[in-house]
Amino acid sequence: MNEQASSATLTEADYVAASKAQSTRKEYGKDLHYFLDADSSNCIPASVDQIATYLAKMAGHLAVKTIERRLISLHVAHLEAGEPSPVHHQRIKAMLRGIRRTKGIATKQATAIVKDDLLEMLVVAGKGKPMQVARNSALLIVGWVGAFRRSELATLRCEDIAWLDSGIEITLRHSKVDQSGAGFVKFLPNAHGSRCPRLALQHWQTVSGITEGYLFRPINRHDQIGEQPLTPHAVSQIVKRIIELTGRDPAKYSGHSLRAGFVTEGVLAGIPSYQLMQVTAHRSEQTLQKYVRIGKRRRIPSLL
C-alpha cells in the first residue's frame, strides 16, 4: 500500500491518538483495561452508575493521583469514541471531592539525586564490566546534566547529538512537552574530567561502536550490547540498581530522580528559573515551584 493510500485510511480517532505522546497513550490504554476488567458489565460508553461504582472501588486501595489519572483516561476514551463523558457528571465530581478530603492529595515524589549523590553513584557505576560501566556512566551524567525524562533518554539517537568545543547539543525529536515533533534543543556544557557529558558520551560510543541509531541500549550479562533501545522502565531500573549500591533505598528513587536532582541543585545554586527551564523544557515556572520550595527549605541555616 502506498503512502497516499495509507494516509487515506486514517480515521479521526487515529489523529486524536497521534496527538498524544506514545507513553501517554499506553497509560490511557492500561487504565481503560483496568475499568473494563473491574466488572464484566463495564463498557464504553459507560453510565454514571458504572463510573461511580468503579470510583468507590478505587478509593479503597488507590492513591488520589492514580484515581484522577484513571478518570482522565476514561474521559479521553469517551471523547475518542464520540460519546458524552460521564466523568464530568456532578455526582462523580462530588465523589472525587470527598475522596480527596478523606485520603488527602499528598503526592509521592521520587527522591532527587543531587550533585553529591550523583558523584557517589558515578564511583560505584565505574566498577564492573567495560560496556556497562561506559553506558551507565554516560546515562547518569547526560540524564542529570540535561535534566532528561526517562522516556527521552531511552529514545536518544546518535543523530540527535551535535558536538561542540564547549559541550554538546542534543535535539529531542519527541517529548512530553513537544508532541508535535518540532524538536527541542538542549545544551550540555563541558565539565571537569570524568563527569563531563561530552567525554562520557564519546567514551561510550568509542567502546560500544554505536555511531548511529539508538544511543542507549540493553547490555546482557556477557557485556554484549543489544540492537533495540532501552525502555523507560529499564532506565529507572539502572538508576535504582546503582543508587542501591551506594547504600540508599532504591524504592525512593526512579528515572525521574536525575531530572529532579538537577533542578533542585540548580535552585540551591541560585540559577534563575528561566535558565533552568531552558534545560528542563518546563512550560511554566509554576511547574518548577516544588523544586524551588525544596531549595529554599534547604538554604535555612542552622541556629546552633
Model features per residue range: what roles?
Residues 1-304:
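Extended, non-catalytic subsegments within catalytic or DNA/protein-binding/adaptor domains
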